Amino acid sequence: MKKKVLALGAAITLVAPLQSVAFAHENDGGQRFGVIPRWSAEDKHKEGVNSHLWIVNRAIDIMSRNTTLVKQDRVALLNEWRTELENGIYAADYENPYYDNSTFASHFYDPDNGKTYIPYAKQAKETGAKYFKLAGESYKNKDMKQAFFYLGLSLHYLGDVNQPMHAANFTNLSYPQGFHSKYENFVDTIKDNYKVTDGNGYWNWKGTNPEDWIHGAAVVAKQDYAGIVNDNTKDWFVRAAVSQEYADKWRAEVTPMTGKRLMDAQRVTAGYIQLWFDTYGNR
């Protein structure tokens, strides 16, 4: 869920510059925050600083535990082509056309209006489904490297809409500015507390169309939005600029719903991967 956030190009000229501020809960000796925050060294192959990869890996773990519904040769293929899968997950945030010239417009999708935050831009539902299908075409053509790269891309967009801010078009420039990125940094610090430990993915959850799965995930995520972004958490986040107490308060407030979202994301992702294999079959 971690988001590399929103340089909006010319649109940023319409937004007042952000004041540089060291948040009370940051322990890096005074990290400064601007429109594009300085992220920790996110690594395409290290899930500790890559929540998208963490969710996909936990989903594969779920699949590996379910020897009744999941053919284990599918898990073997995911592991065989893990590097390509991880490259796709990572590229979505760092390469064009996937990150939309640093606007990340295609990483958002509001299920109520079917749009991202930029008018007429591609959104996560259509983009995630596009790469799901391209992955399938490559798979059928036995181009496994390209297939699993595209699958990684698709899984990234699915992962985004499981994050309530992405399902409500709440960007890093939404008020309070910077909340989106600081929240996603926080998620990295607690995610290991919410690992699914069983083999129960959301199998056959939303039919056979990837669009329906991405839409369904966004619907559920947006329902949980108020548990993360609300008047209290916004106020406490602003106060956290000078107060450790308020930094602790907003983090504590968002933790229960964040845990729920992380667990749902793992189960949905397991089912989505299973759908892909069901759709395009084994070699």
Curated annotation (Swiss-Prot):
SMART domains, per the entry: Zn_dep_PLPC (SM00770)
Domain Zn-dependent PLC residues, every copy: 39-283
Complex formation: Monomer.
Gene name linked to the record: cerA
Organism encoding this protein: Bacillus cereus
Name of the protein: Phospholipase C
Prosegment residue ranges: 25-38
Protein residues bound to Zn(2+) 1: D93, H107, H156, D160
Key words, A-Z: Cytolysis, Hemolysis, Hydrolase, Metal-binding, Signal, Zinc, Zymogen
One Pfam family here: Zn_dep_PLPC
